[in-house]
Amino acid sequence: MENFPTEYFLNTSVRLLEYIRYRDSNYTREERIENLHYAYNKAAHHFAQPRQQQMLKVDPKRLQASLQTIVGMVVYSWAKVSKECMADLSIHYTYTLVLDDSSDDPHPAMLNYFDDLQAGREQAHPWWALVNEHFPNVLRHFGPFCSLNLIRSTMDFFEGCWIEQYNFGGFPGSDDYPQFLRRMNGLGHCVGASLWPKDLFDERKHFLEITSAVAQMENWMVWVNDLMSFYKEFDDERDQISLVKNFVTCHEITLDEALEKLTQETLHSSKQMVAVFSDKDPQVMDTIECFMHGYVTWHLCDARYRLHEIYEKVKDQDTEDAKKFCKFFEQAANVGAVAPSEWAYPQVAQLANVRAKDDVKEAQKPILSSIELVE
């Protein structure tokens, strides 16, 4: 395994944060903790239900970690939506992360997908059955156009995860494959469309801005994620078909060249995002900017991305990029480093155990006859 290109990563991260003029002021600390706990508490109770526990079959520690990661992403990035919308989106995106981390072959459960869909039957695939049950809770927040984007993008995501089960990075010379797969599993349209709940935006009035935002967000969101994920995925066996690694295979280039390709595309997308919306409806621009800054804060602060390891490694270095990166990291930590113990309680496993005990008690109650009830 090659050594991680720390200096290049620092330079790339600094350029990105400078391009978007990073300055996360989305919340006070009290507001952040309040929203985190509200979204987490509702989502935790959802996943503690017996049906979810039985059908997902996810290791409790992994489910807990996934839920905490997603709640952080949604609350930090969707700073303008209601707490109820945050909670429902947190549940939806936790389902997607659970699928992304799974290794089950979906083929057998997908044989009758369309027939079941057309007939209104429950899907054989347990993930689809649960996601479809929750979808109305998500879609109630959005107009029909945004809702269609959420549905379609979620279907694309499932297909992208299916492709990833084969650990196939593309054939050499297949230049379109890396971006094809990344668009498929990136949830860019789902994210881009879920920024515009109908209680804040009339999608008919803002149709052009929303459509453009979905188009721009598709690339910006996934490319930033790929850059910020590059460190954690660098030597992870599960993540060897990342966009950067697929660039190496399909374009037949070096790892440094692939990272530079991703860097240039991300920076260009960041420039576009700021330029396109800077003179549009102020509420639209504010929503996009809050998302961008919150999304970066989440990556810098969430343990899943391990960027604190980079910080610890370079904090005593005297290079310009190291100093700038550490300044940005500390800026993010000042607003976004909130210990899970302050908001992620109770644990899903604890809630599930309480439910299980209550179900046992209910089952053990004596059944009274109709005569006894009358007496």
UniProtKB/Swiss-Prot annotation:
Changing residue 364 to H: In strain: NRRL 13383 and NRRL 28439. InterPro entries: Isoprenoid_synthase_dom_sf, TRI5_ascomyc, Trichodiene_synth. Pathway: Sesquiterpene biosynthesis; trichothecene biosynthesis. GO terms for molecular function: trichodiene synthase activity. Changing residue 317 to K: In strain: IBT1958. The keyword Cell wall biogenesis/degradation does not apply. Changing residue 278 to A: In strain: NRRL 28336. Keywords: Lyase. The keyword Signal does not apply. SUPFAM superfamilies: Terpenoid synthases. Pfam families: TRI5. Changing residue 133 to K: In strain: NRRL 29169. Changing residue 206 to N: In strain: NRRL 28336. GO terms for biological process: sesquiterpenoid biosynthetic process. Belongs to the trichodiene synthase family. TS is a member of the terpene cyclase group of enzymes. It catalyzes the isomerization and cyclization of farnesyl pyro-phosphate to form trichodiene, the first cyclic intermediate in the biosynthetic pathway for trichothecenes. It serves to branch trichothecene biosynthesis from the isoprenoid pathway. This is Trichodiene synthase. The lineage of its organism: Eukaryota, Fungi, Dikarya, Ascomycota, Pezizomycotina.
